[in-house]
Amino acid sequence: MSHSDLRLTDFRRIVIKVGSSLLIDSAAGKVKSAWLAALADDIAALHRAGKDVLVVSSGSIALGRSRLKLPSGTLKLEESQAAAAVGQIALARIWAKVLDHHGIGAGQILVTLRDTEERRRYLNARSTISKLLEWRAVPVINENDTVATSEIRYGDNDRLAARVATMTSSDLLILLSDIDGLYTAPPGINPNAKLIPVVESVTADIEAMAGAAGSELSRGGMRTKIEAAKIATSAGTHMLIASGKIDHPLQAIIDGGPCTWFLTPANPVTARKRWIAGSLEPKGVLVIDAGAVKALDAGRSLLAAGVTRIEGTFARGDAVVVRGPDGHEIGRGLVAYSADNAERIKGKSSAAASKILGLTGRPEMIHRDDLVVSHHHDNGHNNGSHGVSTPAPEPSA
């Protein structure tokens, strides 16, 4: 794939990361309102074109520091957490206001490292974000600095943005930066430094080009952006770094402005399913009936109605093996219910399952995006199979 083949408007689900130094005027201690309004114009244009847009926004600690009139310098952990508590309110209000100008709702999501590393919490966070996107809102995501400690934090929003992109099967991650891409050397030091327009894969040479640049307002430099690229591209998400120091930075990318693309050979769904199939140890087994086998072969989700037996002890979000009535493995997936709850609702319709559990959560035992079908049957057409859920369109590059 060449640089000319890459068009921002071809992507369906886009995560945009905005750093503190772009959003906050450190001298005045205020948000750069005109710049943010221009960025919101760009986001609204993508939204009108039918794109799913997510924002990962830094700035809560910087805003809190300003609102509390704290002196410059490094903050202790508890000081950062207290500043974030004040700043998170301000940050949410700011994003809600600029997006509301375009008739777009904003939803605040505060996450910690464990929300994307532990599968149960991962599923909860992902389902919340998915519902916001379904309602055509823009999720505004930040690390929950009020509760994150040094041991369980990302420490930068570049890697958080990459995790969000992979969690939501986004096909593009945009890191808006104070530099317009990856250079062969630090451009502020070496006048001969050249912008690299496309990175096919993150090699040791590419990593060596990443300087350690950072600022008091921002915890991340180019090194964390390269780490983000490794996370994103390994999960099937393309990434680009572009300058956010101009008005309408997304439109500038569309118009062919300078940036660096990091390419992935896979799409998000393929990469995610490879991870489920090969990297996770199954904790249990779901045995399903013939109708559900047909449903899975047709690309549907697995509903409780099609499950006949539960084996093993597992929690929500654990990997399980799916077997057909003859005992052969049909596939593997991330189960949406614990073994106890799965046992209670097996063979039941979605309405009955919801009544038994006293909730109206996901009707699927395993969602199709969390399921890898490894053995296909010659089932012809799916006529009246139970255990069936109509598939939703998958994001694709």
UniProtKB/Swiss-Prot annotation:
It is found in: Cytoplasm. Residues 374-397 are annotated as: Disordered. ATP binds at K17, S177, D178. It catalyses: L-glutamate + ATP = L-glutamyl 5-phosphate + ADP. Its EC number is 2.7.2.11. It comes from the Bacteria. Substrate binds at S58, D145, N157. It is an enzyme of class 2 (transferase). Pathway: Amino-acid biosynthesis; L-proline biosynthesis; L-glutamate 5-semialdehyde from L-glutamate: step 1/2. GO terms for cellular component: cytosol. Coiled coil: none annotated. GO terms for biological process: L-proline biosynthetic process. Residues 283-360 form the PUA domain. Keywords: Amino-acid biosynthesis, ATP-binding, Cytoplasm, Kinase, Nucleotide-binding, Proline biosynthesis, Transferase. It holds the Pfam family AA_kinase. GO terms for molecular function: ATP binding; glutamate 5-kinase activity; RNA binding. Belongs to the glutamate 5-kinase family. NCBIfam families: proB. Catalyzes the transfer of a phosphate group to glutamate to form L-glutamate 5-phosphate. This is Glutamate 5-kinase. It comes from Afipia carboxidovorans (strain ATCC 49405 / DSM 1227 / KCTC 32145 / OM5).
